[in-house]
């Protein structure tokens, strides 16, 4: 075991996580997530998304879901686990980003206040519905089956998981990866494994707003970048990841309740390493980036042993978080990746056929190190060049997906037709959908039962 492995072993011990895959005492019903509860949370978020769309689509346009995901991230308290549905406060300072977008679209102050009140009421209702307790333990049953999806020359195997009326999908490759991460034995307890997987997929779909195009807040850097970081800077742990997109075995994530069973070290802001080399790619939210800057600086100021952080954030010159990172006394390298010259892996990679997303906006990649870290892992021009090359977008058009641009309108994806259907619109409008539904141009309408029609969530 080398020095870095020893550090990671100590970190896992501090978090109460054994290195083997045996089910530990802490992974019990006291902390285990309930599939029925996560299904209710998912359904409640879909209802909130419907209200957001009704209130804002005329102003924000077809990509309202991107604004919804950012609004959720801004309102959500990043330090609290279990709060996927945001605060129900009528007025919240964190609504500023949404207000600016609405004002830019021509909304008046009074109209924005009305929108805020309606969203607050919808959030309160969603939180109440999500917290309702299931009376029947059978509601936690999860059904799993393999399916094949795709078209236009692109096909992929997926696993479909259903709990109650909520059906979600993930790629077979990610399903198999979760088997290796799970702390139980998937062969001996397949039902338990499927419950755990459903909880993870449902939680992250809810965090993203349940829309099939969402996921920008969970995007990851390309695998080649991780390989370069590990080879040149001994990076073996991610501070902002999930069981669905983590490259390394060691990672922190936003939802310990669902993720600890797959090896998560917990919330990044509760994680306090005293040595080691780490990757930080937080959600592109100004408040989270600002908090990360303070967290990293505090850790570096206290560390006596080598400590290094590779940070990926948007190039927001005027934001408090970016300025604090770029002007920090610990910042030893700050490189700009221009738009279209780098790519990210989709935040919904676990359910999409296409993976890489060329960026339509510039990004900053920074190294923050203490003196010991700077000496142990020097950042050289050759190292920076290798990182830049690893970030390069794919050259083959077939590997591309939509550009990372909130104002873009183009999108392409392959998807199977629903059973017994001859078009992309379901005949049964009450059928529940996953976060990966296909687009169809339909108008907003109500189903016969009074709820939002399935086509409501398609553009």
Where are these regions (language model features)?
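Class I S-adenosyl-L-methionine
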Residues: 1-280, 284-459
């Amino acid at each position: 075991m080398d020095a870095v492995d020893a550090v990671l072993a100590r970190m896992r011990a501090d978090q109460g996580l054994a290195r083997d895959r045996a089910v530990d005492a802490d992974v019990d019903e006291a902390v285990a997530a309930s599939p029925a509860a996560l299904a209710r949370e998912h359904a409640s978020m879909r209802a909130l998304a419907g209200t957001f769309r009704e209130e804002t689509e005329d102003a924000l346009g077809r990509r309202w879901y991107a604004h919804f995901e950012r609004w959720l991230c801004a309102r959500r308290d990043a330090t609290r686990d279990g709060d996927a549905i945001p605060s129900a406060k009528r007025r919240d300072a964190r609504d500023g980003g949404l207000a600016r977008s609405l004002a830019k679209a021509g909304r008046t102050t009074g109209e924005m206040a009305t929108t805020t009140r309606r969203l607050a009421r919808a959030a309160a209702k969603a939180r109440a519905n999500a917290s309702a307790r299931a009376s029947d333990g059978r509601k936690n049953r999860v059904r799993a089956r393999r399916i094949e999806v795709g078209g236009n020359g692109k096909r992929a195997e997926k696993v479909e998981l259903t709990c109650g009326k909520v059906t979600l999908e993930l790629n077979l490759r990610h399903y198999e990866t979760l088997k290796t991460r799970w702390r139980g034995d998937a062969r001996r307890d397949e039902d338990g494994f499927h419950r755990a997987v459903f909880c993870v997929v449902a939680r992250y779909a809810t965090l993203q707003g349940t829309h099939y195009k969402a996921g920008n807040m969970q995007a990851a850097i390309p695998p080649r970048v991780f390989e370069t970081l590990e080879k040149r800077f001994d990076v073996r742990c991610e501070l902002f990841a999930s069981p669905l997109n983590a490259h390394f075995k060691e990672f922190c994530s936003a939802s310990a309740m669902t993720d600890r069973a797959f090896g998560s070290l917990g919330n990044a802001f509760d994680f306090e390493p005293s040595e080691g080399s780490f990757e930080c790619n937080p959600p592109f939210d100004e408040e989270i980036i600002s908090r990360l800057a303070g967290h990293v600086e505090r850790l570096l100021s206290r560390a006596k042993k080598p400590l290094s952080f590779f940070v990926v954030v948007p190039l927001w010159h005027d934001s408090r978080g970016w300025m604090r990172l770029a002007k920090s006394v610990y910042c030893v390298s700050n490189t700009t990746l221009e738009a279209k010259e780098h790519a990210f892996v989709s935040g919904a990679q676990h359910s999409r056929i296409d993976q890489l997303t060329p960026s339509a906006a510039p990004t900053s990649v920074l190294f923050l190190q203490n003196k010991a870290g700077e000496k142990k892992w020097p950042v050289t021009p050759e190292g920076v060049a290798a990182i830049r090359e690893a970030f390069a977008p794919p050259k083959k058009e077939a590997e591309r997906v939509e550009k990372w641009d909130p104002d873009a309108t183009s999108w392409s994806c392959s998807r199977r037709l629903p059973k017994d259907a001859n078009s992309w619109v379901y005949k049964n409008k009450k059928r529940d959908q996953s976060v990966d539904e296909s687009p169809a141009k339909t108008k907003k309408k109500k189903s016969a039962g009074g709820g939002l029609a399935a086509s409501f969530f398609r553009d």
